[in-house]
């Protein structure tokens, strides 16, 4: 007898308050990296009705107009006009930026290994903080990602496209989706059990119209018909009305959608957010490296699913630990996999930066619709170019 179990993940649109904040922080980061690839950036944003506040620590040789970057980002999302209660042209923008603490900088610029006489240039940069980071991959989708989070992201991308192209003219920027997938006893997805989708809208449209348009033009356009059946539940704007949204409805803050950003709850999370941080911050760069490792392990068919943990001490280049968990799906031992990871992937911060070319302005595009499993943009940690090296390791 097969065992039925359900798993749910969610995503939010680029117009969600927390995602506005993420995009502003990463837009500032990208603009700095265009002019100074070695910029040290920790940029946090909060948004509310008519107001944006940008704070943080930035050390750079570049000058950028932060106000201009903020306003352009907001307008690009679609917040143009006073009826939204938040308008990129007229909102207030407060900026309070300090330099990176010299106490932190001395450990990042001059790692413990360098101070102890190690001459390898990739030892020079120490981790920007202590912490633990996870990466994950599974063979249940082509992207080697969990199905619930991928469907949730695709629903949000689809509704944004229909809004921006004016196919559905009453849509406003804020939206959320949640998808529940049924799995069989072999952990394979077999059907979609429930879809929840809430979208901000103009005041003069009926709930019936929204429901019809969302089901026909969004859900059925994204989710394969083979995964939908007569028992699939659709909850479309279940409160009945969603006119007030975006920062007018809820304050937004950088780094508050870390599960949306990663694996939708299917994997563990170390707690560190990504947006607004340059690559010396291992919260970001080591999470990308862990995904890169996990994806290559699954692509090499060394496991059906895998989770990788990396942990660091502040000011130290080498990770304090590396862990590989295949959940019993591995074709080789986890001990051997860990050895392979340590040999093939350089997990020192400078090694990760070089391996994934992370000094480029590539981050704003990750600040909505997920950092992993993306096929609409080219991200270096999504490459599977280490498959051959992994397979060669196990031939010896």
From Swiss-Prot:
One of its GO terms (cellular component) is cytoplasm. Pathway: Amino-acid biosynthesis; S-adenosyl-L-methionine biosynthesis; S-adenosyl-L-methionine from L-methionine: step 1/1. Residues 100-110 are annotated as: Flexible loop. CDD domains: S-AdoMet_synt. It catalyses: L-methionine + ATP + H2O = S-adenosyl-L-methionine + phosphate + diphosphate. ATP binds at residues 16, 174-176, 241-242, 250, 256-257, 273, 277. GO terms for biological process: one-carbon metabolic process; S-adenosylmethionine biosynthetic process. Belongs to the AdoMet synthase family. This is S-adenosylmethionine synthase. It comes from Pediococcus pentosaceus (strain ATCC 25745 / CCUG 21536 / LMG 10740 / 183-1w). The gene is metK.
């Amino acid at each position: 007898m097969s065992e039925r179990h359900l798993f749910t993940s969610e995503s939010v649109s680029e117009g969600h308050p927390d995602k506005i904040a993420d995009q502003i922080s990463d837009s500032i980061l990208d603009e700095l990296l265009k002019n100074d690839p070695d910029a040290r950036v920790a940029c946090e944003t909060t948004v509310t009705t008519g107001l944006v506040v940008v704070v943080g620590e930035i050390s750079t040789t570049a000058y950028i107009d932060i106000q201009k970057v903020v306003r352009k980002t907001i307008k690009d999302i679609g917040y143009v006009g006073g009826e939204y209660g938040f308008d990129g042209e007229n909102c207030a923008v407060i900026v309070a930026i300090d330099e990176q603490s010299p106490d932190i900088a001395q450990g990042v610029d001059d790692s413990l290994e360098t101070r102890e006489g190690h001459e390898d240039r990739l030892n020079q940069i120490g981790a920007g903080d202590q912490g633990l980071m996870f990466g994950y991959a599974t063979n249940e989708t082509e992207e080697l990602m969990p199905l619930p989070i991928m469907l949730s992201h695709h629903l949000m991308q689809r509704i944004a496209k229909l809004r921006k192209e004016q196919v559905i003219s009453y849509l406003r920027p804020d939206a959320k989706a949640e998808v529940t997938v049924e799995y069989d006893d072999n952990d394979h997805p077999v059907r979609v059990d429930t879809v929840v989708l809430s979208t901000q809208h103009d005041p003069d449209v009926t709930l019936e119209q929204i429901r019809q348009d969302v089901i026909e033009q969004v859900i059925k356009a994204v989710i394969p018909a083979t995964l939908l059946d007569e028992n699939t539940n659709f909850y479309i704007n279940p409160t009945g009305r969603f006119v007030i949204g975006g920062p007018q409805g809820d304050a937004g803050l950088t780094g508050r959608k870390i599960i949306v950003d990663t694996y939708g709850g299917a994997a563990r999370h170390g707690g560190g957010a990504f947006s607004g941080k340059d690559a010396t911050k291992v919260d970001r760069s080591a999470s990308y490296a862990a995904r890169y490792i996990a994806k290559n392990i699954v692509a090499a068919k060394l496991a059906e699913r895998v989770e990788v943990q990396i942990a660091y001490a502040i000011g130290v280049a080498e990770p304090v630990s590396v862990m590989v968990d295949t959940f019993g799906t591995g074709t080789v031992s986890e001990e051997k996999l860990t050895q392979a990871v340590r040999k093939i992937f350089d997990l020192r911060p400078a090694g990760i930066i070089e391996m994934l070319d992370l000094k480029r302005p590539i981050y704003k595009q990750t600040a909505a619709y997920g950092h992993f499993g993306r096929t609409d943009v080219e991200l270096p940690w999504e490459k599977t170019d280490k498959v051959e090296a992994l397979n060669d390791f196990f031939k010896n």
